[in-house]
């Protein structure tokens, strides 16, 4: 157990350990579970989840954990239409992303990020894969900080592009498929 395996980081910590232990992991549809609004907490939530992910991956890579993780295709959960997030709240995330980007040195070589940029699913998966290459070379928190502005801009692009639950579900499925293909490619070519 590491410091980030509590709070928001617990789900990813347990899931990665289960996957590396060869256990079958599946998502259970909860139906119409109503979540408390969390858009305003997304930055601290992301920091904890991402740091927990990178910390756990680093631990698992250096342990004797089983590494034949199967990323078999699973269907994205059907998203439930929620209250739309206001344009002002989305614009605030974009402003925060630009502020964090300007004040956080990046760990990866990439294109500059500007407030007019759209972080598409393709660019997002590329950013994720580039950050995977620095696991073990710097702190997990530092990796999470480096990826945070890209995540916020991905959220902004996602919200701008998807105005209903079906479109949002399709976007998540396409992004997941792309990430699995890229992960499998990286695993066999590096």
Model-derived segments and spans:
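Conserved catalytic loops of nucleotide-sugar-dependent glycosyltransferases that act on lipid-linked
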Residues: 1-55
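Terminal low-complexity segments of carbohydrate-biosynthetic enzymes
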Residues: 50-190
């Amino acid at each position: 157990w590491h410091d980030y395996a509590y709070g928001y980081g617990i789900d990813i910590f347990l899931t990665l350990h289960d996957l590396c232990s060869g256990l079958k992991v599946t998502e259970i549809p909860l139906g119409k579970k109503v979540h408390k609004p969390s858009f305003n907490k997304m930055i601290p939530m992301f920091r904890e989840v991402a740091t927990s992910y990178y910390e756990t991956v680093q631990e698992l890579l250096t342990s004797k954990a089983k590494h034949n993780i199967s990323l078999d295709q699973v269907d994205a959960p059907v998203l439930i239409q929620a209250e739309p997030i206001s344009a002002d709240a989305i614009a605030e995330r974009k402003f925060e992303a630009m502020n964090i980007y300007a004040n956080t040195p990046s760990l990866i070589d990439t294109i500059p990020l500007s407030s007019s940029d759209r972080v598409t699913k393709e660019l997002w998966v590329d950013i994720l894969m580039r950050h995977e290459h620095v696991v073990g070379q710097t702190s997990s928190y530092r990796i999470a900080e480096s990826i945070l502005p890209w995540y916020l801009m991905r959220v902004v692009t996602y919200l701008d592009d998807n105005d209903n639950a079906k479109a949002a579900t399709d976007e998540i499925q396409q992004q997941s498929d792309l990430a699995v293909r890229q992960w499998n490619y990286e695993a066999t070519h590096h």
